[in-house]
Amino acid sequence: MADVEDQLSDDEKVRIAAKFIIHAPPGEFNEVFNDVRLLLNNDNLLREGAAHAFAQYNVDQFTPVKVEGYDEQVLITEHGDLGNGKFWDPKNRVSFKFDHLRKEATDPRPQEPENAVESWRHSVETAMRAYVKEHYPNGVCTVYGKTIDGQQTIIACIESHQFQAKNFWNGRWRSEWKFTITPSTTQVVGILKIQVHYYEDGNVQLVSHKDIQDSLTVSNEVQTAKEFIKIVEAAENEYQTAINENYQTMSDTTFKALRRQLPVTRTKIDWNKILSYKIGKEMQNA
């Protein structure tokens, strides 16, 4: 193993380390980072060479963070990325610096939104926050309003997680919704993602996603926001139900086909009893 390690260049070592970090399960970034740090045994190389991996992980995972001086969390996403390590909090109208390794948000500064789309963004944000509060016990949402390719666009991101390291599991829900503000009707595009890692007496990961498309009637800001949330709620409810039903079916069929829970005799083997019996026979033979 040492010979193989010696043959790898620093670039190859960093590339491998970055892959481990990017694919770290939710809630386990620090554990993976510490393991990679021990394997690489070069802190400067890791910090400089894998910095992009830290950033990609936080952006991909919709990492929630509390900005210094503000109470409510904001999500780290590509839509709020201002470049040079700065991100945007559209609700509080501030930009801030984000340390991808420490996961700390500092140096908040005023950042005004695009006036042309702000009233729409605010209406969707109000409706979305109410929806998230109702359906996600630990949920955080961030709603952006942008002009993309000349079109006024609303982007809503949701993140909710449960980290239960003491019970050997961690999980995260992410969803992203987008629509353009056009007369009469528009198309809503969404992607839903679930990632769960269970690692007690084994190592099982659930990684699932679903793409959504639907049409939305565009009227005034408030009514459009309400109709948008109806689409979001229906799609996310359906997805969650399908995941639950699918894995119940797998538990009842696929998993049982792969491995019996009990032997053919339908009774569990008492290994202690067998061992005692075997030892007793051996003692008698002696």
Swiss-Prot record:
Source domain of life: Eukaryota
GO molecular function: actin filament binding
Pfam families found in the cross-reference section: F-actin_cap_A (PF01267)
BP GO terms, sorted: actin cytoskeleton organization; barbed-end actin filament capping
GO annotations of cellular component type: brush border; cortical cytoskeleton; F-actin capping protein complex; membrane
Modification N-acetylalanine, positions: 2
PANTHER family, sorted: F-ACTIN-CAPPING PROTEIN SUBUNIT ALPHA (PTHR10653), F-ACTIN-CAPPING PROTEIN SUBUNIT ALPHA-2 (PTHR10653:SF2)
Family: Belongs to the F-actin-capping protein alpha subunit family.
Role of this protein: F-actin-capping proteins bind in a Ca(2+)-independent manner to the fast growing ends of actin filaments (barbed end) thereby blocking the exchange of subunits at these ends. Unlike other capping proteins (such as gelsolin and severin), these proteins do not sever actin filaments.
Protein name: F-actin-capping protein subunit alpha-2
Organism encoding this protein: Ornithorhynchus anatinus (Duckbill platypus)
Underlying gene: CAPZA2
